[in-house]
Swiss-Prot record:
<keyword id="KW-0472">Membrane</keyword>
<keyword id="KW-0602">Photosynthesis</keyword>
<keyword id="KW-1133">Transmembrane helix</keyword>
<feature type="topological domain" description="Lumenal">
    <location>
        <begin position="94"/>
        <end position="123"/>
    </location>
</feature>
<keyword id="KW-0150">Chloroplast</keyword>
<keyword id="KW-0812">Transmembrane</keyword>
<feature type="transmembrane region" description="Helical">
    <location>
        <begin position="124"/>
        <end position="144"/>
    </location>
</feature>
<feature type="transmembrane region" description="Helical">
    <location>
        <begin position="73"/>
        <end position="93"/>
    </location>
</feature>
<feature type="topological domain" description="Stromal">
    <location>
        <begin position="145"/>
        <end position="152"/>
    </location>
</feature>
<dbReference type="GO" id="GO:0009535">
    <property type="term" value="C:chloroplast thylakoid membrane"/>
</dbReference>
<comment type="similarity">
    <text>Belongs to the PsaL family.</text>
</comment>
<keyword id="KW-0603">Photosystem I</keyword>
<protein>
    <recommendedName>
        <fullName>Photosystem I reaction center subunit XI</fullName>
    </recommendedName>
</protein>
<dbReference type="GO" id="GO:0015979">
    <property type="term" value="P:photosynthesis"/>
</dbReference>
<feature type="topological domain" description="Stromal">
    <location>
        <begin position="1"/>
        <end position="72"/>
    </location>
</feature>
<dbReference type="InterPro" id="IPR003757">
    <property type="entry name" value="PSI_PsaL"/>
</dbReference>
<dbReference type="InterPro" id="IPR022980">
    <property type="entry name" value="PSI_suXI"/>
</dbReference>
């Protein structure tokens, strides 16, 4: 048992954060396929994809847990609440880009002012699109359920 658990590089004062979970090929593949880490994506497409998921998942909590959840306008209020939060978050992303990146930096990388502006623009468009898509799905859920029963 003493050979199994031993200090990293035989030095008890050096730590290592590698675990069987973090070093597995499954975890590495899963993380490398996320849009934040995927190689070859432009900042605009990266922001668009990340924004779509955020917009899509923001509608549900506002719709089901918002103060108007038991009224007829719950879905509309949930969508407008999600859109309001999306605009606030896009403003925060823009402010972060202004204070974090030098305007002299060039290139299409995400760590430049131009790249961050593209990311923010893509995120805003994607999140509004994701919230709109969630609204369309929830508003037509009864139609979708009757359509699926016809296929059986």
């Amino acid at each position: 048992m003493t050979q199994f658990v031993k200090p990293y590089n035989d030095d008890p004062f050096v730590g290592n954060l590698a675990t069987p979970i973090t070093t597995s090929s499954f975890t590495r593949t899963l993380l490398s396929n996320l849009p934040a880490y995927r190689a070859g994506l432009s900042p605009l497409l990266r922001g668009l994809e990340i924004g779509m998921t955020h917009g899509y998942f923001l509608v549900g909590p506002f719709y089901k847990l918002g103060p108007l959840r038991n009224s007829e306008v719950a879905l509309l209020a949930g969508v407008f609440s999600a859109l309001g939060l999306i605009i606030i978050m896009a403003a925060c992303l823009a402010i972060y880009g202004v204070v974090s990146f030098n305007t002299n930096d060039g290139g299409e990388q995400l760590q430049s002012a131009k790249g961050w502006r593209q990311f923010t623009s893509g995120w805003l468009v994607g999140s509004i699109g994701g919230a709109s898509f969630a609204y369309i799905l929830i508003a037509n859920v009864s139609f979708l359920q009757t359509g699926s029963s016809l296929l059986k």
